[in-house]
Amino acid sequence: MDEIVEDSSRVMEIEGQNDDLDRCVVEEVELTVPKTDDPTLPVLTFRMWTLGLGACIILSFINQFFWYRQMPLTISGISAQIAVVPLGHLMAKVLPTRMFLEGSKWEFSMNPGPFNVKEHVLITIFANSGAGTVYATHILSAIKLYYKRSLPFLPAFLLMITTQFLGFGWAGLFRKHLVEPGEMWWPSNLVQVSLFSALHEKEKKKKGGMTRIQFFLIVLVTSFAYYILPGYLFTMITSISWICWLGPKSVLVHQLGSGEQGLGIGAIGIDWATISSYLGSPLASPLFATINVTIGFVVIMYVATPICYWLNIYKAKTYPIFSSGLFMGNGSSYDVLSIIDKKFHLDRDIYAKTGPINMSTFFAVTYGLGFATLSATIVHVLLFNGRDLWKQTRGAFQRNKKMDFHTRIMKKNYREVPMWWFYVILVLNIALIMFISFYYNATVQLPWWGVLLACAIAVFFTPLIGVIAATTNQEPGLNVITEYVIGYLYPERPVANMCFKVYGYISMTQALTFIQDFKLGLYMKIPPRSMFMAQVVGTLVSVVVYTGTAWWLMVDIPHLCDKSLLPPDSEWTCPMDRVFFDASVIWGLVGPRRMFGNLGEYAAINWFFLVGAIAPFFVWLATKAFPAHKWISKIHFPVILGATSMMPPAMAVNFTSWCIVAFVFGHFLYKYKRQWWKKYNYVLSGGLDAGTAFMTILIFLSVGRKGIGLLWWGNADDSTNCSLASCPTAKGVIMHGCPVL
């Protein structure tokens, strides 16, 4: 309550101003976000701390647990957002209302009144801290499970915690640019805003209709019941690759039709986990972003990949058409461990004898698209947002600046988080990372100058990527450029490369996550200091749980991530960790000079940097030449070029299913059923998330842990139905289970 600096009459004063001034610049925000605030509502309550910490711990454990699975379903904070509602109301009824430490500065009550939406938002912020995973876990997995090296717990934990907290510093530097302007609207936040409204607003039921909470409960129960089919009884519907059935013994047909190992033409998944696993909820994607992603996917997957493969570029036919694996020149798997010396560096002599590492052409092109996305992002933001960014930078600390409607309410009613809070966290983290680089250098391999360079890259790209994410719901990654830079400057050290990538790339990603939460707090009128406190505590708790869970699974599950030793039907294949490990070999152990430089076979891939830099100019020039055609400005090359950045480990079926659903809801329903979309779209997304997540947990706890499965044709996965999709088509190449041409 001490954060309130104006009474609620100020809100009414703002609401009485000119309608044009009050109208949000983004229509979806205008339709979804409430324009009211009650600054007297209690926020940092006993209920909030209890339910928030509980949700954070549970989700952190569950998400880290499922991260190692073939379809790494991420249980979003929406699941906890729903589950805590009855618990919050129950606590409001049964907890004592007595005041503790009455009359002092610290007085509080375990039950200050009805369970309110602001408590609920902060509980969800705690839950969001546990919704996902800590990217630095990949380093732990790579070292222990793939490189088969020992890793002490303390440096592992310090890596995890510094990765997460470094982002707070960057978030503080750029929050005014990426939170306060109305144009920076962060589309996925509207799912949670809509759900909060459904759960807390008293909505009158129309005759023959449903309230949003009734609709949500129906979707929740339905999706919960339905997921028993793709999750256990009929798993084949996670990827229906029907084209493979037309040619059971044809490698070509399998390559074209496989949704998991091929191009996925016609493949579709009737499974919410398949649809939303890698790209997030399609219901939260703006139409122009959906169209850009779809164009990018179609051009890359159905035009570029087949052309490169059948022209045999980079000996494409010697390897699978779609794979993140590393291969010998004859098509067999590359024995990475054989080229590492005792100091965990590249053994140059053995590498020279063994021969260079080869990739599938798709994997090589994926890296090229990463180069293009990076340069396209810089040029696009400078061309289309550069002037606005410059104005925002100049006016960020000016008193009389134009502000978004919701920002004006927050400025009137609450005190901001002082910048020195962010500076303290930033300085402490950089100091701790420096300590790690000196004291545990044998483990992390990263020198002090590498730490500073990683921080510089994160600072430079946070506002650029932030503009893209805040307006399109797509977030181009920096993993390629960070790997490239340190790979050239400090080659043959895989752990140094991984650590540099985590500090340079993931600290930026974390910053954008914190900024997105700040925007959610702005939409829901949460006191900024309370929001900051929830973020810091939630992040700390989640890191502890993530680290402990990952460490436990690495010890407890035999042959975790090792496909060669796991049972054929095992889910513990770790697709994300495998890609991360392969990247550490390419960029860290072998180094970009031997792969993409003058010593490598893939040097031509560097031309993608130029392609990405040039592409946005065509759109920019077209907007100047044809200003009446507003659709031209919606052509977004960073999104088009980065559309398949998650492939692999994402598969074709994830994209085909996502694009169809996103287009149906983002175009047809938004255009022709606007009122239905406004009322139910984001609520539907939340219900599907929650129901699928709850059934996934139930399946694992009831039968998954015991290894109880059903053996019948409906549980044959895509790799069984399209078993020849990963076969080479070059003459004389021998691969187990494949015909020799």
Curated annotation (Swiss-Prot):
NCBIfam families: ISP4_OPT, OPT_sfam
Gene: OPT9
Alphabetical keyword list: Membrane, Peptide transport, Protein transport, Transmembrane, Transmembrane helix, Transport
GO BP term, pick one: protein transport
Role: May be involved in the translocation of tetra- and pentapeptides across the cellular membrane in an energy-dependent manner.
GO-annotated cellular components: membrane
The family this protein is said to belong to: Belongs to the oligopeptide OPT transporter (TC 2.A.67.1) family.
Lineage, opening ranks: Eukaryota, Viridiplantae, Streptophyta, Embryophyta, Tracheophyta
Membrane-spanning ranges: 48-68, 121-141, 153-173, 215-235, 287-307, 320-340, 362-382, 419-439, 448-468, 537-557, 602-622, 650-670, 683-703
UniProt xrefs under InterPro entries: Oligpept_transpt, OPT
GO molecular function list: oligopeptide transmembrane transporter activity
Official protein name in the record: Oligopeptide transporter 9
Membrane topology according to the record: Multi-pass membrane protein
Superkingdom of the source species: Eukaryota
Location in the cell: Membrane
